[in-house]
Amino acid sequence: MKLGANSVLFGGYDMATVFRCIQWAGYDGIEVSAISGMSEHLVIERWQTCAPVIRQLAAEHGLKLLAMEQPSQDPAIMESAMQAAVEIGLPIINCGPGGKSGDEASLQQVINSLGRLADRAAHYGVTLCVKAHVGAAIYNTPTTLKVLAAISSPAFGLDMDPSHIHRAGENPVEALRAVVGRVKHVHVRDCRGRQAGPGKPEEQANGRGEIDLLGYLRVLWEHGYTGPVDLEIIGAREYPLERCCLIAAEARGHMQACLQACGAR
């Protein structure tokens, strides 16, 4: 498994600062945020300008380019995102599910949309991943399984995020066992309680909440998962840089200890 951090944790800072701090925290790689409103890292509207900067920074800091997070399923936006992924060398694009929880028609619309986007991902030679998300059409294990049954493209996979499954009232470790064969990316953070939001950024750091992340990573290891495990902490755009660095380092230390306990490192 490759440990990375999503640049959205450092959403208030420029890319040179982000790469430097993620390297200093000891991560293997980086997930580049293309989340409008949360960061100005990979801006899809001007990706041609961003691409060489990202490639140069990755080489300079020895960080693997693990994934991109671009939440929109808009076909034009995603087409540009896929072109950017190819140019930069990002093998995975993580998008949001969209839609409405508990609405079968909404879920079917999401399945249709993701199926079309998976075809485009195959065209570009990248992998499209989606995760269950609180309040969205895909929000728990049953809805996740419906999507996985409907879309068999090898260019499509699951981005498994234990914090959303936890807030859906499930046990993330058991939920992971049901889908692990289709997992191609992992977003990781901790969470206290089962409310709609994941909590303050510092409360999302691995080990601060209620999720059995050791058990979670053990299941991944036991099933031969070798893909990215990317820390995704949101809400820290206005935080001082030092605080963002501390969150990144704390979470990475917890992940490293978990992998060592599993025998994965």
Q: Language model features by range: what are they?
A:
Residues 1-7, 11-29, 59, 86-89, ...:
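Histidine-acidic metal/acid-base catalytic patches
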Residues 9-11, 34-36, 71-73, 97-101, ...:
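Active-site-proximal loop/turn and secondary-structure-junction residues that shape catalytic pockets
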Residues 31, 67-69, 94, 129, ...:
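Conserved beta-strand positions in the central sheet of alpha/beta enzyme cores
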Residues 31-55, 101:
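Glycine-rich, proline-tolerant flexible connector loops at the mouths of alpha/beta enzymes
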Residues 41-48, 76-81, 241:
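Metal-dependent catalytic neighborhoods of phosphoester/phosphodiester hydrolases
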Residues 49-53, 77, 172, 213-216:
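Alpha-helical scaffolding within the catalytic cores
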Residues 57-60, 64-158, 167-169, 243, ...:
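Active-site acidic/histidine proton-transfer and metal-coordination neighborhood
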